[in-house]
Amino acid sequence: MINLNDAYEIADFIKNSKKKTPVKVYINCNNLNPKSCDEFKVFGSNDSYTLIGNYDEILKFLNENKHFITDTFVEFDGRNSAIPMYNYLHEHARIEPGAVIRDMVSIGKNAVIMMGAVINIGAVIGENSMIDMNAVIGARGIIGNNVHLGAGAVVAGVLEPPSATPAILEGVKVGKGAVVGAGAVVTHDVPPGSVVAGSPAKLIKMKDEKTSDKTKFIDILRNLD
């Protein structure tokens, strides 16, 4: 089992993994009755079939049977991918279309992941947290509970609640209740309850009631029922 706390082990896993190109291939054919096998699954009947699996194996089948095939159409969304997408069908979370979530992540209960968000291998999303549009969480990035990661934010380490469009370097921890200003580049740990901004980020003040009102969560958005 891969150690997701070791960046070198993750890199080695990606380097040595079998690269795959997942596809769906729709075919019309005459006098051909393809069957599911270890390399791909087959669905359909009456000379119209869908083949689902790795492109290289399916292409070999198509070439071997090209005289029986009258038409094809291929759907794909990657090429030689090292890490499959995460299967989140059974997560108790709201995940919008267009979110890109790699395998081996953890998604907490009632989390919300918006369209365009990118979550890489080993990332952890806490309960009741929202990952907003086009936010990026790098490998091993950890988002705590009740965090709102703002639109376009970039995270590459262990942290808690940043605001819109900061860049937070790997290994930096943002303390509980802290606010990271838009466009900030965070190179050092941020104390709990503080407000930082700038490039590099500097302490502006400790969070007051006005700042808390601006950054509080809209709980209704996390209702999945």
PLM regions: where:
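C-terminal appended segment following the main domain
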Residues: 189-225
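Terminal amphipathic alpha-helical/low-complexity segments used for targeting or macromolecular assembly
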Residues: 1-91, 212-225
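Residues that scaffold the ATP/ADP-binding catalytic core of kinase and kinase-like folds
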Residues: 61, 158, 206
